[in-house]
Curated annotation (Swiss-Prot):
The gene is petA. This is Cytochrome f. It holds the Pfam family Apocytochr_F_C. It is found in: Plastid, Chloroplast thylakoid membrane. Its cofactor is heme. Heme binds at residues 25, 45, 48-49.
Amino acid sequence: MKKNLFLVSVFASLFVGTANNALAYPMYAQQGYENPREATGRIVCANCHLAQKPVDIEVPQAVLPDSVFEAVVKIPYNQEVKQVLGNGKKGGLNVGAVLILPDGFTMAPADRMSAELKEKVGKLYFQPYSEDKQNILIVGPVPGKKYSEMTFPLLSPDPATNKKVNYLTYPIYLGGNRGRGQVYPDGSKSNNTVYNAAAAGKIAAINPTEKGTDVVIDKVDGGSVTVAIPSGPDLLVSVGDTVAADQPITNNPNVGGFGQGETEIVLQNPARLQGLVIFLGFVLIAQVFLVLKKKQFEKVQLSEMNF
C-alpha cells in the first residue's frame, strides 16, 4: 500500500509540472478508472489529451500457445518541436502508452525473453494496469526522442492450462500519447491549452502574477471578471481590446496529442498446423504420383505409335 501511494505521489508530481517531465499519462487513468477502455471503445486517456494524433501497432499475424512474441508500438511526432512544461518553460515531449491485450495474454517474464528481445526493449519499464488486469500494460512517461517506438515483450496463454482461453482471433487495443494533456483529472485546465474570455466585454487590465497572468475583463452588462492564465500560453489580446464570450485570448500551445489503434492476433492451435502440414504433404505426394503416372502414360502412347 505504501509503495502504491509513493508511486501515485511521484507521478502526480510529474503531472502538476516539473520542468523535465510531461503529464503523467497513463498513471492518472489507473487512479480514476477500473478499466481504461470504455464500453464505447474510447480509451479514457482521451479525456485529458484532447488533440488527436496517430499511433501504430505491429504484432505477428498468429502465435502459438505459451510463446513469447513482441508488439511494436509507434508514437510518431515531430521531434524538433518543444512543448510547454508545467513551469511554463519549453522542453521535449514525453510519450506513454497503454496496451490492452486479450484475457490471458501477459507481459513476458525476463527469463523467457531472448537476448535480442531484451535489447529491443531496452530500459523500458512496463507494468500491469492493476493486479486483476495483468493483460493491460502501461508504460511512461518516457523521453519521446528515445522511445517514440517501443517494443512490448508479450507471452501468449496456453488453452491447455487456462480453460478461459480458446484458439481464436483476438483484438488488441492501443492508446498512445505524446506530450502533456490539456485537462487534469479533476476537470481543471493545465497550462498546455487555450484559454478563453469568461465573458463578453473589454480587456481592462493585464496583470502579471507569480504563476502567470490575470486578464481582467469589464463585462458588457456591468461588473468585471478575471481570467487567471498560467505561464505557458501566449496572450493574443491587449488592454482595450473587445472580446466575445468564449473567444480565445491565448494561443493553443499544445503540440502533442493522443491516438488509438487496434489490430488482431490469432492464437493458433499447434494440432491444426500439424494437420495442415500433413495434408499438404499428402497433396504434394499425390501431385508427384500424378506427374509420374502421366509420364508413364505418355511413354505407353509413344511406344504404341512407334509400333
